[in-house]
């Protein structure tokens, strides 16, 4: 019982400390973190998109692995859009900060579709997996059209 309590207290302390660190993070650091998360999302989603489009041979093991990474990564960038980060040069459009409800919906949609892909990828149904890859791509693209500046 003592061990469980120690683990619980330690976990809560780390959770609170990580929140405090995030709250104190400088805007430029937050922007770099969100950009890194988005880069990794692209890295792990890209091959799956290629498979869904028939440009790359389908590989169920790669899809399952990448879908798991994508599910975790889809949760990471959003804290990087904190107040104050709009002053840092990036491709985030002003709408990210002025229409926060719509932006949050878009982020939530990506997370939900990525979670579905991670689940579907374990089933082995190639057609269902490719359809879900398309749904993830649509979630990504929908956000990019509204909230990201063109290069």
Segments from the language model and where they lie:
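Sequence context surrounding c-type heme c attachment/ligation sites in exported
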Residues: 28-60, 66-151
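Bacterial N-terminal signal peptides that target proteins for export
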Residues: 1-9
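N-terminal signal peptide c-region/cleavage motif recognized by signal peptidases
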Residues: 17-20
């Amino acid at each position: 019982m003592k061990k469980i309590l120690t683990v619980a207290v330690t976990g809560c302390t780390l959770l609170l400390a990580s929140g405090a660190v995030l709250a104190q993070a400088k805007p430029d650091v937050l922007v770099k973190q969100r950009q890194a998360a988005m880069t990794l999302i692209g890295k792990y989603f890209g091959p799956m998109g290629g498979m869904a489009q028939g440009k790359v041979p389908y590989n169920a093991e790669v899809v399952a692995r990448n879908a798991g990474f994508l599910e975790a990564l889809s949760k990471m960038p959003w804290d990087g859009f904190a107040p104050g980060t709009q002053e840092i040069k990036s491709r985030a459009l002003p709408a990210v900060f002025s229409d926060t409800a719509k932006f949050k919906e878009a982020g939530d949609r990506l997370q939900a579709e990525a979670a579905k892909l991670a689940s579907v990828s374990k089933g082995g149904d190639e057609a269902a997996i490719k359809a879900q890859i398309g749904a993830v791509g649509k979630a990504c693209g929908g956000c990019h059209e509204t909230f990201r500046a063109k290069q």
